[in-house]
Amino acid sequence: MSMTDPLGDLLTRIRNGQRANKSTVVSPASSLRANVLEVLKREGYIRGYARSELRPGVAQLSIELKYHEGQPVIREISRVSTPGRRVYSKIADLRRVANGLGITILSTPRGVMSDTEARTQNVGGEVLCEVF
């Protein structure tokens, strides 16, 4: 069965898993999802993730969620650019999330990265999601 918004599905699984105080959540694997998870791991929003093969050609990602003193580290995670409404931004037009406490994840010509990395590399792109 095809999925209209795979990244939106990943973000919803993370959001629902943290609301239910799950330690791990599982999602179908794709390179975009893995790249977004790598940014979340690097920025300290998740403990980590692992890719496992269910059968040849079908893989899944197991995501270890992170909590601090019993509270989810991710307070809010939301999709900005959707399949029906793509949102692109120059680096100068990119706004800070939660007064700099959160991050924006971008898909740029140099790969998927956080807004701080995009600012240092001076590159804009598609605004995938915001996390804080």
Curated annotation (Swiss-Prot):
One of its GO terms (cellular component) is ribonucleoprotein complex. InterPro entries: Ribosomal_uS8, Ribosomal_uS8_CS, Ribosomal_uS8_sf. The keyword rRNA-binding applies. One of its GO terms (biological process) is translation. One of its GO terms (molecular function) is structural constituent of ribosome. Gene3D superfamilies: 3.30.1370.30, 3.30.1490.10. Transmembrane segments: none annotated. The keyword Ribosomal protein applies. Keywords: Ribonucleoprotein, Ribosomal protein, RNA-binding, rRNA-binding. One of the primary rRNA binding proteins, it binds directly to 16S rRNA central domain where it helps coordinate assembly of the platform of the 30S subunit. Belongs to the universal ribosomal protein uS8 family. Part of the 30S ribosomal subunit. Contacts proteins S5 and S12. This is Small ribosomal subunit protein uS8. It comes from Paramagnetospirillum magneticum (strain ATCC 700264 / AMB-1) (Magnetospirillum magneticum). The lineage of its organism: Bacteria, Pseudomonadati, Pseudomonadota, Alphaproteobacteria, Rhodospirillales. The gene is rpsH.
